[in-house]
Amino acid sequence: MTEELHSIDGTFVDLSAHIKLRVAGNDRLRFLNGQITADIRKAGASNSIQACLLDAKGRLTAHASILAAPDYFLLDADPELKETLQSRLERYIIADDVSVEDVSKLWSIFHLIGKTAPASPDARWVVSARRFARPGWDIWVDALHREKMLEQLSAGSSFCDSNCAEVLRIEEGIPRWERELTNEIIPIEANLEESCIDYDKGCYVGQEVISRMKMSGQRNKKLCGLISTEHTSLTPGMRLLATPAKDKEAGWITSACHSARLSKEIALGFVKRGFNSPGTKLVAAASPDQAGEIQVEVADLPFIH
């Protein structure tokens, strides 16, 4: 299936390129709970959680999904984190009985969107997960059986390739590493508060900053939807300018695509406080190698409810 996806339920994506880490040892629960923004005790073998890892200033170092097996936890994250996620965890292992192992080559992951769990006898785990801000299922299978599982899923579901998955991600307002999520972003700014942050779980790296932001109720910028009112394509990296004078920079675009379901050119971007209310009109300034300006309107996320 191409990016022109019209029906979402019963659609599946291949996440096998994700980095996958196994965290084991007697201190694994206590250790991970001190590293992530979510409560690791809520992860199970039939349901996963989403969590962020932060630095001491509350800025993102990773975003991951986590499931709990009887003797270890499994984390998976965008492939762009392959070189940094394991070292980020190991940096904080002092006298803990904890090991972190890269098991990316051992497992393949598929995600099926829909409320009904798939019948997957060859799967090691079928885990409830909200990858696209809606009910779905992660299917973990031995990497040797990846092609077999792909065939089984394709027999009854629609495959969403990488282009299709990117459009769906943008339509649903889901941030991705190296696009919306970087080492300069605080998770609340990227709308990850509801899905990733537990304010009652106890201490973790970066907690003080997150707690202060919650108490103040303010964030300097916010991840927003943007719609081209001229039906002209938008481009990641475009600057957003306040109208009508265009003398104030209001933010920047991080991801963009054409949405066939909306018949519109849409984008995700960070918009500064004072300019991020839905309906606000802004100008997207062309990248240095392009010419022209595009009128855009701030929109609620997700684009499609």
Predicted features, each with a name:
Residues M1-H63, L67-P70:
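Acidic, proline/glycine-enriched N-terminal capping motif
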Residues M1-I8, A51-H63, I93-D96, A119-V127, ...:
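Short amphipathic beta-strand starts and helix->beta connectors
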Residues T11-V13, K20, S65-R176:
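Acidic, low-complexity central loop/insert segments
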Residues V13-G34, E101-K115, Q218-T229:
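Short glycine-/aliphatic-rich beta-strand segments at the starts of folded cytosolic domains
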Residues G25, L75, L112-G114, I139, ...:
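Residue-level signal for inorganic ion chemistry
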Residues N33-R41, E83, S87-A95, A155, ...:
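Short, intrinsically disordered, mixed-charge
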Residues W140-I227:
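Anionic-ligand-binding alpha/beta catalytic cores of soluble enzymes and soluble regulatory domains
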Residues I185, N191-I197, Y204-Q207, S211-H305:
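Glycine-rich, small/acidic residue-mixed loop/short-helix segments
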